[in-house]
């Protein structure tokens, strides 16, 4: 059950890397017949930190640059979504979330634009926002390097 309340916008969450695989589906069921469960990029990162790396929530929260309470809400949501998808035979699509790759906040000396889909980088052009640029490699929208992106593939 999703809460669509108005309130503060989500703060930027730090992730180690964008997902290399964006969809998982049950074997033997055509994709067209499957219901999708969308797991945000920050929810995937919370699973990586807590379940794969075995970090305590306080350390995982520090790495994602969120409060421990916020991390708890993110990981709880991720666990519910993954369990629902596995139990009910849904595909898992990884996209969305307000995220920034961790190293970009430190190593972003030169302004530029980056494609979150394929990683292609271009110099920033004055007067043209990165979000309005299309990646010449894959055709997806680009974001400002070091800025918060949506983790969303533009279709």
Swiss-Prot record:
<comment type="similarity">
    <text>Belongs to the UPF0251 family.</text>
</comment>
<protein>
    <recommendedName>
        <fullName>UPF0251 protein Paes_1249</fullName>
    </recommendedName>
</protein>
<dbReference type="InterPro" id="IPR002852">
    <property type="entry name" value="UPF0251"/>
</dbReference>
<dbReference type="Pfam" id="PF02001">
    <property type="entry name" value="DUF134"/>
</dbReference>
């Amino acid at each position: 059950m999703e809460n669509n309340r108005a309130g503060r916008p989500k703060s930027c969450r730090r992730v180690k890397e964008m997902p290399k695989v964006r969809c998982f589906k049950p074997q033997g069921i055509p994709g067209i017949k499957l219901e999708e469960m969308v797991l945000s990029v920050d929810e995937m990162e919370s699973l990586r930190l807590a379940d794969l790396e075995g970090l305590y929530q306080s350390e995982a929260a520090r790495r994602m640059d969120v409060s421990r309470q916020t991390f708890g809400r993110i990981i709880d949501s991720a666990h519910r979504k993954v369990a629902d998808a596995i139990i009910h035979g849904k595909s898992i699509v990884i996209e969305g979330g307000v995220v920034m790759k961790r190293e970009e906040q430190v190593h972003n000396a030169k302004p530029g634009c980056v494609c979150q889909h394929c990683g292609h980088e271009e110099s920033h052009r004055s007067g043209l926002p990165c979000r309005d640029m299309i990646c010449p490699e894959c055709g997806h929208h680009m974001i400002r390097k070091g800025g918060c992106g949506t983790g969303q593939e533009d279709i």
